[in-house]
């Protein structure tokens, strides 16, 4: 049952469902726990379909109402949702663990500080596009990971230079010794008087595709990740929107990269980030038929990544181990 049809029904207590969900959201914004719990319990007792919609509303509130005030809010609510459905069947008159789960989620959301600026940011991006101002590909997007960068002679070595593709802002301490070691391993290969050109057999079919506004999709992918690394939030949001309107395949790619970046680029800068981003990725599947909600999840995930301290030590350690194996230093 889609959201429009759901909102035409009445709750067990006689309230219009659409009005009930609107009231619930406003209660969360105001931090009115008792009213929020009362409304939610009425929805819960109405049907299992309403319980499912209730969780979607709570997840939406975690993203759009709480927002950046508590980046882990969605992960917390998602975890309670999993507990709700993994502990017992729907028994509205008995209450039980299902009721405990959403009541706890509501108490948490009502207690959180609120930062509901996501809608404003999405509107700003859309207004820019309507005015003919679209996302752009910066020069730093071209590196050894893509065709354009390899044609310019970029290598894994210059990727590690201070203004290379691996630059992160703000940078947390911890990665520098690993960067130094990897540069030592790569310099004899790609540096010096006779540097070896970098070759790659990897094929990215996005190389032959363009976004609705004419951006090469392979470079758009690269620009998206590197703009987040440099905490260029507005640029990253523009790129995310351009990718989103390019179709489901690009949307899926962005989510894959977001989860990877939470480990690869954020690392020990914010160890909880991978848990946050995994929850975002899982929750977006609940909104397969609701593009507006999926866009909101995507844009908020980008904002969280941009705001996190970044520490690429994990990726650098992996690179060291791989290169040592290639050099024969490891059996």
Where are these regions (language model features)?
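Noncatalytic carbohydrate-binding groove/subsite architecture in carbohydrate-active enzymes
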Residues: 231
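GIY-YIG nuclease catalytic motif and its immediate N-terminal context
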Residues: 1
């Amino acid at each position: 049952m889609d959201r429009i049809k759901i909102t035409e029904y009445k709750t067990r207590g006689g309230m219009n469902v659409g009005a009930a969900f609107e009231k619930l959201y406003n209660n969360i914004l105001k931090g009115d726990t008792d009213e929020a719990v009362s409304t939610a319990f009425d929805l819960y007792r109405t049907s299992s379909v309403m319980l499912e919609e209730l969780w979607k509303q709570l997840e939406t509130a975690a993203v759009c109402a709480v927002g950046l005030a508590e980046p882990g809010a969605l992960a917390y609510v998602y975890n309670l949702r999993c507990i709700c459905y993994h502990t017992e069947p729907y028994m509205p008159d008995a209450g039980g663990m299902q009721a405990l789960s959403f009541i706890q989620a509501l108490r948490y959301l009502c207690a959180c500080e609120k930062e509901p600026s996501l809608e404003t940011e999405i509107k700003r991006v859309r207004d820019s596009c309507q005015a003919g101002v679209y996302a752009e590909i910066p020069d730093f997007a071209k590196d050894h990971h893509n065709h354009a960068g390899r044609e310019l002679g970029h290598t894994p070595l210059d990727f590690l230079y201070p203004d290379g593709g691996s630059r992160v802002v703000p940078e947390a301490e911890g990665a520098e010794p690993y960067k130094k070691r990897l540069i030592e391993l790569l310099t004899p290969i790609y540096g010096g008087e006779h540097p070896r050109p970098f070759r790659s057999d990897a094929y990215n079919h996005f190389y032959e595709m363009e976004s609705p506004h004419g951006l090469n999709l392979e470079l758009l992918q690269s620009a998206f990740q590197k703009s987040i690394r440099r905490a260029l939030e507005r640029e990253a949001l523009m790129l995310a929107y351009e990718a989103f309107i390019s179709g489901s395949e690009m949307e899926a790619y962005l989510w894959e990269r977001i989860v990877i970046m939470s480990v690869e680029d954020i690392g020990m800068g914010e160890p909880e980030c991978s848990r946050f981003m995994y929850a975002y990725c899982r929750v977006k599947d609940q909104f397969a038929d609701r593009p507006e909600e999926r866009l909101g999840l995507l844009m908020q995930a980008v904002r969280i990544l941009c705001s996190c301290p970044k520490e690429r030590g994990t990726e650098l350690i992996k690179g060291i181990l791989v290169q040592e194996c290639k050099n024969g230093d490891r059996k």
